[in-house]
C-alpha cells in the first residue's frame, strides 16, 4: 500500500466486496471507518449509526402539521404525544386550502408571484383580473361619516318635500323666514362696517385737532410732533446731562486735560509728553 517514497499514501475501502485502494479516502463521521468515493454515504456502506442525527418528519393528516420522529423513540409514542398535545384539526383547512381569485369562474390560485391588490377595493386578484373593469371593482370604500352626512341630507330633503305637497303655505313662510334671516345678517354686517369706519374717522380727526402725540418717557401728550421734540430736548436731555455729571474724570498732571477713560490718559501722556508724567 502506497509507494516507496510515500508508504502511507492511500487506504483500502472498508466494504468487504470493494476493498478498493483510494488515495483520497473518506472517513465516516458515525462509524469512523474508511470508505472510497462510491461507498462514502450512509446508505452505500449500510452505516449502523447513520440514523442517530437523521431528521424524519411526518405530516399529520388531521392538522397538516409536521411531526418530527425521534430516532431513539418509538414512532407510535411520538405520534400519541402530538395527538394529545399539539394536534389542532381546525388548522387543516388553513394549511391545505389555497386562496383563489375572487372573480367568478376564475380558477387561478393566488401565489406570491401572481397576486396583485387593487388600490380601490383593496382585494387580491390574479394578473388577469388586476384592472378594475375586469373584476367589476366597486370603487374606493366610503367613509362612515360621509354616509351619515348623506343620510342626514336625505332626511332633511324628505322633511322639506313632504310639507310642500301637503301645505304650500308653510313652504312660503319658511322661504320668507330664510330671506328675513339673510337680510338681518346683512344689516348687522353693514352696521358693524359703519361703526368701524366712524371710529377710524374719529381717530383721524383727533389726530388733526386733538392731542395724539405722547412722550414715551413721561407720558405727556402734545398736539404736534414739533412740540413733543422740544419737550424731549428740554426736559429729558437735561436730565441725561445732569446724570452724566457724576462720571469720574482723570486729569493729566502736565497739561490738566481731562479724560473719562484711563487708557486715553495713558495714550495722551505717551504721545504728547513722551511718556513722562512729572508734575
From Swiss-Prot:
A zinc finger (C2H2-type) spans 213-236, 250-273. Transmembrane segments: none annotated. Signal peptide: none annotated. Keywords: Metal-binding, Repeat, Zinc, Zinc-finger. InterPro entries: AN1-like_Znf, Znf_AN1, Znf_C2H2_type. Zn(2+) 2 binds at residues 28, 31, 45, 47. Zn(2+) 4 binds at residues 118, 121, 135, 137. Zn(2+) 3 binds at residues 101, 106, 126, 129. A zinc finger (AN1-type) spans 7-55, 95-145. Residues 169-178 have a biased composition (Low complexity). Residues 152-178 are annotated as: Disordered. This is Zinc finger AN1 and C2H2 domain-containing stress-associated protein 11. It comes from Arabidopsis thaliana. The gene is SAP11.
